[in-house]
Amino acid sequence: MKKQLLLLIVLACAFVTSVKAEFQLERPKLVVGIVVDQMRWDYLYRYYNQFGEGGLKRLINDGYNFENMHYNYVPTVTAAGHASVFSGTTPAFHGIAGNNYYLNGKKVYCCGDTTVQTVGSKSKAGQMSPRNMMVTNMCDQLRLATDFRSRVIGVSIKDRAAILPAGHSANGAFWFDKSAGCFITSTYYMQDLPQWLKDFNKKNKKDLNQDIAPLPIGVTLTTRIAIAALDGEQLGKNPTGDTDMLTVSYSSTDYVGHSFGTRGEKTDEIYLTLDRELKVLFDALDQRVGRGNYLLFLTADHAGCHNAKFMNDHKMPGGVWKQSAKKKELNALYAQKYGITNIISDFFQNQVLLNRAAIEAKNLDFCAVRREIAAKLAEDSLLMYAVPFEEVGSSSLPPAIRDRVIMGYCPGRSGDIQVITRSGYMDYSYEQGTTHVAWNPYDTHVPFILMGWHVNHGFTNRPVAINDIAPTVCAMLKIQMPTGCTGNAIYGD
């Protein structure tokens, strides 16, 4: 009887212990979010046999790979992409409708903020903040969950690629000032550069004293500043035990893509450099934070189209469709018809912004004129569709396109008419380089790989969307998703 009683006590203790273990909250020491500007998904395999063992191959072979990750909106541009990755939503909700967009009829830069000043140089390159983003992101949610004990830092060559990922409540975001040859920030975050960044700028002065953006050294310096931030801010070594976060965006890949396209020696060079630099970063994380102690993901803010001439040379469809030429043509037409000099104020990101004030000053019905201009645009043989934004939901657009237009439309910040070009047609140089803005897979299909803390190796080909990344990371951290989140957790379900 005593033995049976003892056995019951032991079993009861074991049960209580197991229950306690189930409810123990665990989080990694550090989260690292990496964005590679303009990285197409297929680059993972185009260069696979040329990659070393510790960079992108490590991600592919150790991480969990979402092979069918797409952007689910247009326009597919840098600012919108970075905002979407970290906020778990799209321009319709986060408000970053483009790199530049219109607010109350005035053209604004996505991160422009004249209420703050540059810290680290005498230029205006630091008059930036995340204030135009209308929602929180995963970094903000981490800060909220830990009563702001978590430390969040964002770094990139591009200001928007450092600022938008780091969120509203970041401890710091740092970007490159080409005119001064150093990394800077703004008074939104602090009044003086941290000592580690002053030391970094001084140590790397020779390399920084050039336009690093389109060069392999730009990739190298991005890695260097990421590691400098890791050390300087002691990320992953929070004295409170809370999770820290580092966001790193590699911009040089985008500059090379725009200049040289998706193929060629320069593109090869930049991605092989990226691979080597990722190994350097991963090794630093292993040494400083500990392998298995950090959660890391890699994705892209958009992809990129093959150059039109390259496609034509290989007997495939593609070409150039110039927004500026179409704007000039339509303005001339409607100046004659309605006596309005510039009925189209701007043509950007495949969107038409009409001169509402001029139209209404002529006592014309704005909606009727907008519909008329959309119909005129639709006559262009290089366009598939031209639809007023407010009529997209009831239009004949195929659902795959219609839904992307709706998710990318932000009232008051987007244009009046959305145009959809034929596949492979873009507003760019025919001979060389490329761009991105479209709904097509060449602009929307990007990598998304998780690696590290509590991540098992594997892959899936099921369709997932860019706004699923933030809720996935938040679910893994057991924190609330961002305030405008429209995606779902996709790992561990």
Question: Language-model segments: which ranges?
Answer:
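Short, solvent-exposed turn/loop segments enriched in Gly/Ser/Thr/Pro and often Arg
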Residues: 66-86, 154-162, 249, 295, ...
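His/Asp/Glu-rich, glycine-adjacent segments
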Residues: 90, 95-242, 251-258, 378-381, ...
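Secreted, luminal/periplasmic, and some membrane-associated catalytic domains
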Residues: 51, 68, 77, 99-127, ...
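Bacterial Sec-dependent N-terminal signal peptides
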Residues: 1-26
